[in-house]
């Protein structure tokens, strides 16, 4: 066993470790933060080393086949438990082999952790018999753009260009991410530069640009682009539907109606997507009866209402406290021969929650089970949010414990439960939920970290809060100004300015690091 431990840490890591400890010991108040991290590094290296021998034995048999989800989950655990200093060696020693499906799964799980995601992306690229798929590149482009690493994003695009992997969707993603960051000019530039990448813009790209602008609440700019470029492309029903949805979100119902009429005049027949958007717009404008009239006027032989349309109607009736109409609409859908999906059931659950009819909520869950419809994280979140808002926290936790047996909670689910226990001053239980979430391989969001750090600050558990903040930064997640400011005030009050300086330096690295070696 000792032989494996010696091999688990290479010479460069040992040099870094000892020089690192020598520097840190000059500041006694900082030691408790860094010492904790250093011990974790050594322990994890030993553990991963022992596992690697067993993993190698398992993989020596051609009969051993691992499920993609299981491998992705195991890689996720390595990523979440390993500091950046030893991340590559931890992945190497895990013995886990990657495939395109596995990499895509992991990238999806860590889509909100740009730094960590990119480290894994780099590591996987070096593995034998593996090449990144177009989808993996697209997911990485999204992750880097999300943390405003645009230079790296274009480096990825150029790498795809060399491999002849670029397509229109690549630039649609770039336009969408720029627009979401309110970089409208850059989004339009991405559209115009396609020609230089041997991809002449087509109607799909044009629609992609309009969609990016509309979804980022820049519908007026989208309308302007449409007017200026409509002669270059022949608008189709999707083009008009995009603008229709954009004006609906503005919200500007008269302009949405105008676009709808223009669509008809241009000879573009509304499809089910157009009708769905129009129903959604009217419902959000408080005109659910008019929306229902549109549904009634649809010719079932040409355009049959979808479960999405019914879910919107049920949801709207619920928010307007028209529970009877919500139930009637649900039953009408079933009578039409259409089977309710999880989205429709969730709308019905929301309607019953709004009316505080919890017995009916639990009956709906039973009906879902009898009809083979599995609740999802949103089902759980709707119920939890309602119970927590009403102060029924014990019942909320009971629902949480039951729901995790039938569905996969997301980060929002865990965040609500952790926040609930922090507010109840039950930090031990909050910590248990946090550890359970990590064990299940669910990647914490910025909000998940924030609620726990804020809870620890409230209890004046400064050391744990600092370690958690450091872990958050290590994962490439930037803390909110409120969370960092709260911990900062606490450290100043406790006269731990050196620890604050250390955390500030870590933050600066996260903000300024270009992510590429």
UniProtKB/Swiss-Prot annotation:
Keywords of the record, alphabetical order, are: Mitochondrion, Repeat, Transit peptide
Pfam families membership: PPR (PF01535), PPR_2 (PF13041)
**Cystine bridges:** none
Subcellular location, record wording: Mitochondrion
Q: Which SUPFAM superfamilies match?
A: TPR-like
PPR repeat segments run: 133-163, 167-201, 202-232, 236-270, 271-305, 306-340, 341-375, 376-406, 410-444, 445-479
Q: Which GO terms describe its cellular component?
A: mitochondrion
Query: What PROSITE patterns has UniProt attached to this entry?
Result: PPR
Which residue spans traverse the membrane?
none
Please give the Gene3D superfamilies that the UniProt record associates with this protein.
Tetratricopeptide repeat domain
Q: Transcription regulation among the record's keywords?
A: no
The residues forming the transit peptide are 1-59
Concerning its family, UniProt says: Belongs to the PPR family. P subfamily.
Name of this chain's protein: Pentatricopeptide repeat-containing protein At1g77360, mitochondrial
Q: What is the native source organism of this protein?
A: Arabidopsis thaliana (Mouse-ear cress)
Source organism lineage?
Eukaryota, Viridiplantae, Streptophyta, Embryophyta, Tracheophyta
